[in-house]
Amino acid sequence: MCGIAGFQGGFSAGLLARMTAAVAHRGPDGSGTLLLEGEDGAAPTGLGHRRLSIIDLSEQGRQPMAAPCPRCGSAGHADLALTYNGEVYNFAELRRELRAQGHVFHSGTDSEVLLHLYAEAGLALPERLNGIFAFALRDGRAAGRPAGVERGDVLLVRDQLGIKPLYVAETPRGVLFASEIKALLQCRELPRRVDPEAVYQALAYLWTPAPRTALAGVRKPPPGTALLLRGGRIAREWRYYRLPYGQEPLAGSSAEVAAELRERLEGAVRRQLVADVPVGAFLSGGLDSSAVVAMMKRATPDARPRCYSIGFRGGVEMEGAAPDLPYARRVAAHLGVELHALEIGPEAIGELERMLWHLDEPQADPAPINALRICERAREEGMKVLLSGAGGDDLFSGYRRHRALRAERAWGWLPALARRGLAAPARALRAGRNGGWMDNVAFRRAAKAFAHADLPADERTVAYFWWNDVELRRALLAPGPRAAVDGHTGAEPLLASLAEIEDERDPLNRMLFLETRHFLADHNLNYTDKMGMASGVEVRVPLLDLELVDFAARVPSAYKQRGREGKAVFKEAMEPLLPRDVIYRPKTGFGAPLRQWLRGELREAVEETLSERSLASRGLFDPAAVRRLVELERAGKVEGAYTVFALMCVELWCRMFVDAPPPAVASEPAAAAVAAAT
């Protein structure tokens, strides 16, 4: 696990050094740069790397890794060159295969396997990999290149599920790429312009769907994407992997599918335990993290894995949710693992600027602060790898919106006019025309469930991911940005993704596809990776092992949702390993009591960040509309806490990524403005 940076085009060695230094936090164990002049008129290429050593801790694992062609016997020192971030879990199997073909290896790293495999597979290389990765591989061979590859071309790849981040920017001088946006901003000719469409989408979802980012000149390739750089331009871009929804569902009973699921999860955890450093885990006491820890214990019965959990000081918890720590302690005692519990309070929100600096994007969710605290504690105690339970809700149907989708069976058959009769009053209630009832959880959820009843089926599915209605977020924009998104609802990128699975007509599976394709890749996995790397910790996600994901896509939706019971087959699979009260406990989000904090300890921070002066100067949001939203939220008349938080995050992000000059060496904000206001 590392940080990468680089370019193809007419850039300098100084820029490469600055870009690599900007991701220094991702790799405290070593660094390297490699500048390769173009042969035969090819554009120069710069590769930078920061190393977090996990497998083969020796100097042989240093990157960028350059080698003669392992297949053609060339004497060229840098026929092939690689900068790589991630882990390939099937690297040992691939290395055995390559050795049988005559390849000779000089290290125990998965990085070297990539170079050798490219020599055999060419552009089909990423299709052979099961892992988490983003890498750039330059082919400088005079001969023996794959079809469609010219000398000096660079293959740029992001893993199948978007577990590792990758950002790309095209400039007149060439293409820049890196693990984080802050590295790209070391190029002073890259414009720091906000993309109003991306901000509009961030208000809707609290995150921005790929390929956009909040910076107009920077994009993130979707999961499973490969790009071929040539002459300082993107010569080709293609998707080498698509989520396999729309296939024939698995045959067999629920019990048989549960048994196979249990076996596949154990295999995934065993693959992801491979490391030359200690491996621990997140443990919330929820089903997903508990299942991962149970499989860790099954794979290493004599070990006591170190696990980490978090709770809120003073008994304050997520609204409408049971506390996690009692369940985490119950699981730890049941499995015989070591639990390290952290407790935080409202002061944790003082980490907001630091969180946003590491996220690179204005994601409006306090959950990354929890992940950051856990990863920092783990690293202080010598841990370099943590396993996470991310992905279980997305693959097997664990979110409330999945139940709401199922509930549509009771009214979805109604004609359009009748559905409009449900939607109009629900939207009016959500817009503030109620008696302060939005503080009531049940009322709030019911209003949201019917607010988009009049939309077509796919648009209705997308709307379950929204945190506010179209009318509100349009009103929040200043006139210029509002004109830029005229005619758009924010649903467009997710609707475009749904077109990838035209053969999948099951409504639940279509929603689960969006969970994995966007909510995971653009939100959960982005913050999981970056909070871990901010702390020098690699976070692995066994539930998103490629073989397990392909299996989950074929599990019948009737086995995922049984009545109001989500993740039914997953729960059935874990019954032999975990206590029933843990398996069937109420769902708890990995977040924070944001409504209480915004109205209490964060009140002054809201006033400062969203002041009329700040907003008018920025020109993104309408100050009067924002003021009205803040007042309605405090009165309990709108479900607006996360929208207010999104507005704050966009403004704070702009101060760091748009206003501030690019530092020579990136450094975290020394003191957050939010912290000063609290």
Label every PLM stretch briefly.
Residues M1-E353, W357-L359, A371, C375, ...:
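Cysteine-centered catalytic environments shared across enzyme families
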Residues L283, G389, L520:
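Conserved S/T- and glycine-rich ATP-binding loop of Class I adenylate-forming
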